[in-house]
């Protein structure tokens, strides 16, 4: 039984979002629909989720003392991380003191570090992954590359959105790749993972919900990546029944091993009937924004329902749908969007995130579309995104 209090009243149910970007904004909206009091926290003011929260705080979330202070002040019933760059040691301490971290502090800590989740998947669970080695010095990096072989990929163990990643084809690239990885790590210089290149037909995100009534799966989401970030996603991604079964088995093993209730974005490589584990996020996934138009319950609604202890039941997928990002390049603290009227229409929607500024390339919105098939849906979403003119 789930008891929910009313926001801003003494018995309010309080949810604190650690990370207030576009994904957190949608989680906040789902909480608001249930009358929950929302507190949004991020490292910069006026972040998207702060626009729809009851209160907000600006702190360095890697600062454990600052994180503990704001949590102690607000006394949330649920702490919901939206990003990886958080003082997870502090979250584990707070969870040990009785606070509820979504899905659990262990999952948040393991997945913020590629080494933690890779060792769990490959070495503890025995799941198929790419070949890999870890390195914490330039000399051991060279040894790792020699062991894995060319071509290979190097990534900081703590980074996101492609930061610090390089595709290495020859020894001449090693020095530059090492330096780039040291610059791109979330917590500064440090360990890297060297991965062998996996031959695959396509990548999917399998949105997997662990709830009081068991583990549930959304239809697989296909996506296209460029420069470490997704550009388009679509649902459902066509794949063989055997590959889908294997993908679901891998996802089930991973989310149950991580523990807790919530939605997980499980990233997988698919080659024919073979499926290889890549990564997992213990929270809604950017490629899953397509579910805002493709399902009766979006990934955000599913996440909230699960961590509140409510049953998920069946997930209804409406049919072929796609998302395409609005990704301008400019510098402005007063962004405007023109021609939006030409982007929307029957079966086509636009979401603008409300980010306060841009300095370079930044994802500021997403177009969503349905279609007779996923190919048509992708075309419609891309066309809608291209029609939005971003100025500043």
From Swiss-Prot:
The keyword Phosphoprotein does not apply. InterPro entries: ATP-grasp, ATP-grasp_carboxylate-amine, ATP_grasp_subdomain_1, PreATP-grasp_dom_sf, PurT, PurT/PurK_preATP-grasp, PurT_C, Rudment_hybrid_motif. ATP binds at residues 114, 155, 160-165, 195-198, 203. GO terms for biological process: 'de novo' IMP biosynthetic process. Pfam families: ATP-grasp, PurT_C, RS_preATP-grasp-like. Keywords: ATP-binding, Ligase, Magnesium, Metal-binding, Nucleotide-binding, Purine biosynthesis. Pathway: Purine metabolism; IMP biosynthesis via de novo pathway; N(2)-formyl-N(1)-(5-phospho-D-ribosyl)glycinamide from N(1)-(5-phospho-D-ribosyl)glycinamide (formate route): step 1/1. One of its GO terms (cellular component) is cytosol. Mg(2+) binds at residues 267, 279. One of its GO terms (molecular function) is phosphoribosylglycinamide formyltransferase activity. Residues 119-308 form the ATP-grasp domain. Belongs to the PurK/PurT family. Homodimer. Involved in the de novo purine biosynthesis. Catalyzes the transfer of formate to 5-phospho-ribosyl-glycinamide (GAR), producing 5-phospho-ribosyl-N-formylglycinamide (FGAR). Formate is provided by PurU via hydrolysis of 10-formyl-tetrahydrofolate. This is Formate-dependent phosphoribosylglycinamide formyltransferase. It comes from Salmonella dublin (strain CT_02021853). The lineage of its organism: Bacteria, Pseudomonadati, Pseudomonadota, Gammaproteobacteria, Enterobacterales.
């Amino acid at each position: 039984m789930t008891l929910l209090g009313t926001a801003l009243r003494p018995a309010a149910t309080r949810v604190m979002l650690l990370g207030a970007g576009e994904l957190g904004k949608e989680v906040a909206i789902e909480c608001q629909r249930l009358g929950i009091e929302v507190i949004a926290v991020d490292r910069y003011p006026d972040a998207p989720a702060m626009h729809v929260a009851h209160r907000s705080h600006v702190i360095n979330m890697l600062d454990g003392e600052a994180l503990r202070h704001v949590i102690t002040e607000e006394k949330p019933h649920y702490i919901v991380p939206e990003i990886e760059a958080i003082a997870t040691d502090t979250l584990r301490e707070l969870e040990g003191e009785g606070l509820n971290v979504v899905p659990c502090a262990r999952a948040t800590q393991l997945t913020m570090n590629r080494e933690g989740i890779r060792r769990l998947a490959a070495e503890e669970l025995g799941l198929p992954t790419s070949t890999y080695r870890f390195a914490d010095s330039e000399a051991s990096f060279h040894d790792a590359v020699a062991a894995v072989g060319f071509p290979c990929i190097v990534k900081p163990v703590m980074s996101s959105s492609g930061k610090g990643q390089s595709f290495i084809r020859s020894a001449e690239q090693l020095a530059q790749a090492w330096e780039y990885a040291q610059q791109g790590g979330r917590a500064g210089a440090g360990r890297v993972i060297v991965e062998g290149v996996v031959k695959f037909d396509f990548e999917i995100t399998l949105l997997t919900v662990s709830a009081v009534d068991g583990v549930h799966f959304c239809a697989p989401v296909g996506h296209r990546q460029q420069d470490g970030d997704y550009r388009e996603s679509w649902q459902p991604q066509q794949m063989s029944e055997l590959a889908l079964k294997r993908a679901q088995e891998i996802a089930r093993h991973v989310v149950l091993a991580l523990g807790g209730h919530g939605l997980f974005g499980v990233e997988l490589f698919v080659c024919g009937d073979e499926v290889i584990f890549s990564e997992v996020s213990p929270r809604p996934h950017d490629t899953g924004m397509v579910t805002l138009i493709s399902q009766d319950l979006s990934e955000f609604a599913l996440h909230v329902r699960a961590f509140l202890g409510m049953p998920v039941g069946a997930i209804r997928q409406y049919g072929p749908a796609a998302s395409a990002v609005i990704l301008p390049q400019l510098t402005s603290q007063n962004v405007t969007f023109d021609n939006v009227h030409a982007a929307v229409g029957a079966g086509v929607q636009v979401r603008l995130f409300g980010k306060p500024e841009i300095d370079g390339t930044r994802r500021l919105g997403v177009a969503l579309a349905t279609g007779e098939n996923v190919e048509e849906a992708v075309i419609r979403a891309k066309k809608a995104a291209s029609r939005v003119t971003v100025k500043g």
